[in-house]
Amino acid sequence: MSYQSILLRQVNSLCDNLEEVARDENGGLIDMAMQSDYFTFDVMSEVIFGMAYNALKDTSYRFVTGALGSSNIRIGTLVQSPLPAMCRIDKYLFPESIQGRNKFLGFIGSLLRDRSKASFAGNGNVFSFLETAKDPDGGNQLSKSEIRAECATLVAAGTDTSSSTLAATLFYLSRNSKCYSRVSEEVRNAFSSHQDIKIGPELNSCVYLRACIEETLRMSPPVGAALWREIGPGGMNIGPLTLPAGVDVGTGIYSLHHNAAYHPEPFKYLPERWLVGEGSSTSESVELARSAFAPFSRGPRSCVGKGFAYHELTLTIAHILHRFDFSATEEDFALRHGSEGPGGINEFLLHDHVTGARSGPLLQFSMRR
């Protein structure tokens, strides 16, 4: 696994931060939204671009995650309705978001300049392939503007989605003690030391850990809105409807994931729903649930990084569970009071800014007992 060494190095860096807090005699409270952002930014920048920005330890590039989050407020609106941009009123509605976008694009420019200072050819990161890729039909390579646009997409996709799912999984485990106890026991029994936790059969055997991650993706999908697609020539039949070419169609992923016809008790965190033979789960019920489960979208436009995201999440959460104990805090309950989603105060609420904007969780960490 070519990226495993990078993942393990960054996981250890994240756990070093958590250990510093966990050993603090004044209390081990930490904002996992911020730590998750810095962690996934560091992983993304090294795996995709071959650059080490070290946001977990160095404050110099932490502004990027904030700028991206601010930029996405405007972008999330325009994805659902491009009219404000057509009328040029978005600059009056979202001045701070546009400033964030400019900061973010400034970082993209600096990233490309940093790469140009040294040769990265053949080092195996994703971007090195993108730079040299050729159209199999015409032999053309991507232009500088196209590479810049791909950069922006890769940074956003590689940072925000995994960050929100990591934070959300820890949130749900901290609020569901039975799930937390079971998954902790599973991981700690599978590995005698956190240094043994690597991608492979032993980690794959932690099926309840995978179920916890999938239940998090169902409850709080990192991209929860409809991803619109235009119907091509000839139109399309969808159920009893015949829709003409040119019509945009989409399914709201959050709504799909909370449809009780596919996911009974949709606002309850129940990892067992993904495991045949657990509780009331049967092969038929699990198959039905998976038919309405699309956190990475589906088809030819589904997320190309799905496999990597699962590796990143399982590896990271396994290390955290093996090394630490953590719990919900009064501060986190206070943070969510008055801003509950449909699932109440025990739902990790995400705001639709293309990817999910979030707060916390604020968790109490201690060294594993």
Curated annotation (Swiss-Prot):
The family this protein is said to belong to: Belongs to the cytochrome P450 family.
UniProt GO molecular function: heme binding; iron ion binding; monooxygenase activity; oxidoreductase activity, acting on paired donors, with incorporation or reduction of molecular oxygen
Transmembrane domains' residue ranges: none
PANTHER family: CYTOCHROME P450, CYTOCHROME P450 MONOOXYGENASE ATNE-RELATED
Cofactor annotation: heme
UniProt function note: Cytochrome P450 monooxygenase; part of the gene cluster that mediates the biosynthesis of the cyclic tetrapeptide apicidin F (APF). The non-ribosomal peptide synthetase apf1 incorporates four different amino acids to produce apicidin F: L-phenylalanine, D-pipecolic acid (D-pip), N-methoxy-L-tryptophan and L-2-aminooctanedioic acid. L-Phenylalanine is the only proteinogenic amino acid directly used by apf1. The 3 other apf1 substrates are non-proteinogenic and have to be modified by other enzymes of the cluster.
Keyword Oxidoreductase recorded: yes
Annotated InterPro entries: Cyt_P450, Cyt_P450_CS, Cyt_P450_E_grp-I, Cyt_P450_sf, Cytochrome_P450_monoxygenase
UniProtKB keywords: Heme, Iron, Metal-binding, Monooxygenase, Oxidoreductase
Top enzyme category: oxidoreductase
Pfam family, any one: p450
Residues where heme binds: 303
EC numbers, comma separated: 1.-.-.-
Coiled coil: none
Pathway(s): Secondary metabolite biosynthesis
The protein's name in its UniProt record: Cytochrome P450 monooxygenase apf8
Applied use: Apicidin F, like the other known apicidins, is a cyclic tetrapeptides with anti-malarial properties via histone deacetylase inhibitory activity.
Induction trigger: Expression is positively regulated by the apicidin F cluster-specific transcription factor apf2 that binds to the eight-base-pair motif 5'-TGACGTGA-3' called the 'Api-box' that is found in all promoters of the apicidin F cluster except in the promoter region of apf2 itself.
